[in-house]
Amino acid sequence: MLIKNFFIAFLMFFSILVHAENKFIVKDIQFKGLKNFSQNEALKNIPFRIGSTISQYDVKNSIKSLFKTGKFEDIKVSFLGKTIVFNIRERPIISNVIVSGNHIIASSVLDPYLKKLNIETGKSFNNFFTNVLTKTIKDFYLDIGRCKPDIKILKIFSKNNSVSIKILINEGTEIKINSIKILGVQAFSKEKILSLFKLQDYHSWWNLLSKSTYSPKELNNDLEHLKNFYLSNGYYYFNVNTKKVDFLQDKKQVDITIGVSEGKKYKISNFFVNGNLFPYQKLITNLININPNEFYNRDKIDIIVNKITRFLSEYGYVNTKVIVDPQIDHKKKTIALNFNIDMKKRYFVKRIYFTGNEITQDRVLRRKIKQMEGKYFNTKLVELGKKLLEKTKYFSDVKIIQKLNSYDSNQIDITYQVKEQTTGSINFGLGYGVDSGTSFNLAFSQDNIFGSGNSLKVDIIKNDYQKYLDISTSYPYFFYNNADLNARFFYNDFKYNFDNISNIIKNTYGFEGNLGFLINNYNKVNFGFGYTHNSINNEEKKIHGKFTGELNINKLYYFVGVDDTRFKKIAIPGDQIFIKVTILKSNKNILIFKNIAVVNNDIICKSKIVFAKKYLF
């Protein structure tokens, strides 16, 4: 036992010595073979520096890190004492890229793809990506039915370790469809079946929307469309048995022959909903709108499955699996459908994040989100938040990213990824008129000022006849989420010159305010208050005896209004017509108006009732 313990201790001591000997302190780092890249740039891509204590493991990692840059073709490491020497062979630098022969693929489409593959001027050349490019372009031409396309990439290397790339594209020739035959069709006419195809033979001049050019991809799409047609009309066992494409002698035309078996039509005898679905069993059953003895319809069943998964996703079950298991009675030609539903875990939202909002404050976005943190995940509310963010017009794009916290967790983090866009404008004008003199105008508008979600508009006009200022601002969330405030301040001086009256100045200034409270998603109550001062002044104090001095009129008013933001659509004859009806019962007491718009055979109605009171003094 003593000998055994001594032997184990010896091995441990020996392994420590070996480990210590494998590590050393770096005295110097050298790079040989660098031409297009500096040594400092190379040093940034290795995990150690001069004076670091490293092992062989660190050296291997440094080689991997240098290769990841994509700038080096070969790397070998040697040691001179405690100096590490990297012997490097650089990849050539692409001096220019020339593409010719591409007529079907536009350069505006091809250039971004070349950039994605790093095939552009100034990048390191990698032969692997040119092979990927060749295969991708060739496959594209074959998919659209081009015969014998050819892609050649010429590489011209120079002495300064650069390469010029020329991409020569031969798009091949177009293949026409000589004939399409479908064998085995009995339930429908040949014309009906062929009308389902986008591909048509070139003799079918009557079908203007068809394509007479052969495309393998388009043919597969047509066959899938044909299968869906049969499966949606009760033919449960329909199948495409054969697909044959024969090239004619000139290789410019093909004959297409399709063999199908229709089978018999099947009806649905009954359906059953299976699974631990409490308390949603009845609600889910109501979503399945299948009547006994109606023909089997795969499209309808797919829609029902989507409705079920969508419904449960609004209650936190985001990974629901619905499997439709048919029980077939071949004798009666009936099918009983079993909707086997596994709701799985119920998820709730842990955190909601926002990214991309460099200007807009988080709180501006968060108040638009209806899904709450700590509540069960609701697809409807999450998507509604996206729509409301888009409705602000602050963002050109809004994306939703869902991330599970962990595999075993039932928590989801939601990220709204936004892309901000310009929400304001400034217009400036300067001119000169014989009567008005030098004229200056400024218009400023900003809908999301300082990222606060508030808006500000300023209009200024100044010339010899007029001094005009109008400032309006809007606070969509003034007190809390259901209250908004709109305010306006205005000032206007306008000078009139008539034949027998001169230097008459009309002066107007005042303010307006409106406070709105949202009652529900559709109705809002508005309370408004305003003041306007109007005066007419004669600078010369004399207007041929008609008027001397000053006339003042002040108006103070308030109003209460009810808005209905719902739009009612009723289809009627008519197109692109707009009708507006305004009814004034009293100019000083009650104002009632109603707008009706007719657009594309629909009536869009927005109604508003306002009770107003005015005081003049």
Curated annotation (Swiss-Prot):
- Gene Ontology CC: one annotated term: Bam protein complex
Q: Does the keyword Transmembrane apply?
A: yes
Alphabetized, the UniProt keywords read: Cell outer membrane, Membrane, Repeat, Signal, Transmembrane, Transmembrane beta strand
Q: Which Pfam families match?
A: Omp85 (PF01103), POTRA (PF07244)
Q: What main location does UniProt list?
A: membrane
Q: Where would I find the POTRA domain in this sequence?
A: 24-91, 92-172, 175-263, 266-344, 347-421
Quote the subcellular location field of this record.
Cell outer membrane
Query: According to the UniProt entry, where is the signal peptide?
Result: 1-20
- Bridged cysteine pairs (disulfide): none
What are the BP-aspect GO terms? Answer: Gram-negative-bacterium-type cell outer membrane assembly; protein insertion into membrane
- Note the subunit structure: Part of the Bam complex.
- Protein task: Part of the outer membrane protein assembly complex, which is involved in assembly and insertion of beta-barrel proteins into the outer membrane.
What does the similarity note say? Answer: Belongs to the BamA family.
Name this polypeptide is given: Outer membrane protein assembly factor BamA
Protein's organism: Buchnera aphidicola subsp. Acyrthosiphon pisum (strain APS) (Acyrthosiphon pisum symbiotic bacterium)
